[in-house]
Amino acid sequence: MSRVASSRVLKDSNGDIGEHLRNHIHLTNCIHLKNHMHNNNKQSPVLTDRSLLMRDLVVLQRSRSLRDPSASPNLKEDHQDSREGRRRSGLRLSGSSPIVSFGTSKVTPSDEKFDRSSRKSYRVEEVNEVYSVPSVKSVSKDRINKKVNEAIVKTLSDQLNEVGGDSDDLVSCNVRPRGDGCRRRKFRGTRRAGRAVNVRDNAAGNESEMSIASNSVPRGEKYEGEEGGGGRDREQNMSCGIPFNWSRIHHRGKTFLDIAGRSLSCGISDSKGRKGEAGTPMFSDSSSSDREALPLLVDSADNEEWVHDYSGELGIFADNLLKNGKDSVIGKKSSRKNTRWHQSFTQKYAPRTFRDLLGQNLVVQALSNAIAKRRVGLLYVFHGPNGTGKTSCARVFARALNCHSTEQSKPCGVCSSCVSYDDGKNRYIREMGPVKSFDFENLLDKTNIRQQQKQQLVLIFDDCDTMSTDCWNTLSKIVDRAPRRVVFVLVCSSLDVLPHIIVSRCQKFFFPKLKDVDIIDSLQLIASKEEIDIDKDALKLVASRSDGSLRDAEMTLEQLSLLGTRISVPLVQEMVGLISDEKLVDLLDLALSADTVNTVKNLRIIMETGLEPLALMSQLATVITDILAGSYDFTKDQCKRKFFRRQPLSKEDMEKLKQALKTLSESEKQLRVSNDKLTWLTAALLQLAPDKQYLLPHSSSADASFNHTPLTDSDPSNHVVAGTRRDDSKQGFSCKNRPSVEDIWLAVIENVRVNGLREFLYKEGKIFSISIGSAPMVQLMFNSPIAKSTAENFEEHILKAFEAVLGSPVTLEMRTESKKDLGFSSLQGLSNGERFRESGRSEIVEVADSESPMTRVRRKHLEASQNQNQNQNQSIVRGKVSLAQVIKQAEGNSWSKHKAVEIANKLEQENLKLEPRSRSLICWKASRSTRRKLSRLKVRTRKLRLHSLLKLVSCGKCLSTRSPPR
């Protein structure tokens, strides 16, 4: 292609076509370089060796085949300019061009000849050469063809051998004008002290290869701008500036040349354009229509203020890329204004002044007074839980120390120091995160500030918990050598991790956990500013879950705000992984009601949500605590529950809750060390209310048939003993009118259809215990084995009577009254609801509201026998309430009540007559004197009346153990 172009140049007599073809030759060389660079980037995309790159660039500059022929000056005009003393300079090749290798270049002898002639005509001082192209008119076509056939091919290695000196000298190929008339010499590959201007690449290391080419700036342009404006204006000889394949490369998008920009200039531009450069217009890249009319390469280095502004089509993309690189790396203030980056609630509402610090009044007051009184220390340590404002307080403290405001409140936020800190440009406030080691010398240099400056250097060391021992040693040395105007602020969560040598020299400020009230107020303020629709109870839950950390509460609120709906308590519970209080109370109600099956089912449903067993146990304990404190509201689903159905809870229910809380706290220890946590949690819930269908009233009972039933505590809800009552909602008994055992027994007797059996059961039998539950069980006690065998013959009638009264099938068990049972039944003479423990026994019995007449008679005489030792001379009847009056006030059927009154009246008359004898007969522990008197008495024997008297009055214990002497 170069041969064809050369022949066409020779045919052109005027030189216009030749100038145009030289532009196309220049474009061909650029395309050639593009292909070579593309191939080399595939092999080694990372430019690792800078020195080799510089040497290649020097060779590229000196390669005559890569020069821009259109930039060559006209021979006649150049001679004329030389005589007029005009100064000229050429373009320089950028040192940051990413070209690694290029193809071979041919240097013809004719080029060398005309190069020597050009050196004679023009004197050049700089490292660069000003190349001249011979006139087209002075060369014939035959001579050109002959010289081309004799061309010598020089490879890159041959050209590199010709280049001597340091490759780092890629100073720039600048052309500096000299005012003196001495001979100007040409230096090849050598440095001249004080003449070269070093060009550095200012682009970031992580930029792309295209940005490397576009960010290089020729520094020597300022010399040309100072001296190039004193001549006459000349027209720029850029020809048409449109390549031959413009229509193809223009519409396919950005090419390599568009991306590389003007810094990849592969030749020497026209030196004629150097004259009158001040009048060269600056092209804009605002519209596509403007860019279509721009020339390919235009030198814009004449204005020193536009150092990075390259005119022409190839430099437009480079300008945009350079601007984008600056905004991304440096972060200009203008880019921050135009681009609105998202800030979290923690960053957006971070404290700016001491008044913004929440819940740290003592710390704020102490630091404010220290600044106002100028009593600032050297070392401060802020310690406390996370999210309490330690780092924020350190930043506010640092701003206040450097604030220029003369008012009392600092920081002001409007002075130069505060504004520079907000922009991230304050060099007197340094924050250092957790690092493995410190650069001792570098950090010490930062602390060395000028004494005449009023600013104080504040070094904030955040998260000191993770600092190593070497860091502490280095910090200790820095503190020893630091000047007075340096303040160190250490931020950590605990003082235990800090060395003692540091802690002993610090002013320590503790940041406690924030109160829920303060956190709720702050969250309400944020919610109102951000227009978040949230319930107050939900805010309370968020604050309670934050554990005194405002930062955690703000992050939780920000997450909830992303849902886009009204924030309620169930939504917060689901978000943070909690179970609703209603579900917890339902589970607790089932566990306390001994509903084993539903308890296990509900527990499995809750655990399927992914909740940890420890967390569930902790929530259950929290709910129990709220119920005991009276702060829980049972307004919802109260009718569906069993244990919590009655409100307010009784004392017995409160005791059960306390026992349940104790059980959960003890089970938590096992739960932490166990691998199967769900099993332990299930066992703990089932222990809250074990199965209590059966009752053992006597732990020392000799009957082995009751050993299979579990012992019970003081809960009488499912068990009724002789003389007790029971509240059973399943049977329809209300709390106010629950039947007693005597009422049940009388109702059973009335339902017996055999008349003789009725009287027999009333005289010989009684209910010993009854259990009403899923499988009701009744135990009947008879006075003798004969009576028991007689009742067994009528067992079917008795079962039907019990089923009619209780409304369900009953398991009936009969037994004979023993001596212990007789003593037990004699102890049931207390008032309603009371319990007592007999001496030498461990039975606890609950007494019914009303007693039968026979029971009252026995209780009356039992009390008299117990008081005999205290006052033996006191009469049994005198000074006490009449038995007839007591029986009249007793509850019961009218027929039995009337009969009991008659018996009581007769009994009182007999007691008045036989008072001394009854005293010794009732209790065998009477004194000897009383027994002697009784032996001398003449008693008329009446066996029948005495037998009836002993049957009704005597306790049975004294007569069975010891008979009185006669």
From Swiss-Prot:
Coiled-coil portions: 650-678
Annotated binding of ATP, by residue: G384, P385, N386, G387, T388, G389, K390, T391
Gene Ontology molecular-function annotations: ATP binding; ATP hydrolysis activity; DNA binding; DNA-directed DNA polymerase activity; metal ion binding
Binding positions (Zn(2+)): C403, C412, C415, C418
Similarity comment: family membership: Belongs to the DnaX/STICHEL family.
One Pfam match: DNA_pol3_gamma3
Residue ranges, compositional bias (Polar residues): 98-108, 208-217, 706-717
Protein name per the record: Protein STICHEL-like 4
Positions of region (Disordered): 64-118, 200-237, 706-733
Biased composition (Basic and acidic residues): 75-84, 109-118, 219-236
Lineage: superkingdom: Eukaryota
GO biological process terms, semicolon-separated: DNA replication
Source organism: Arabidopsis thaliana (Mouse-ear cress)
Keyword terms: ATP-binding, Coiled coil, Metal-binding, Nucleotide-binding, Zinc
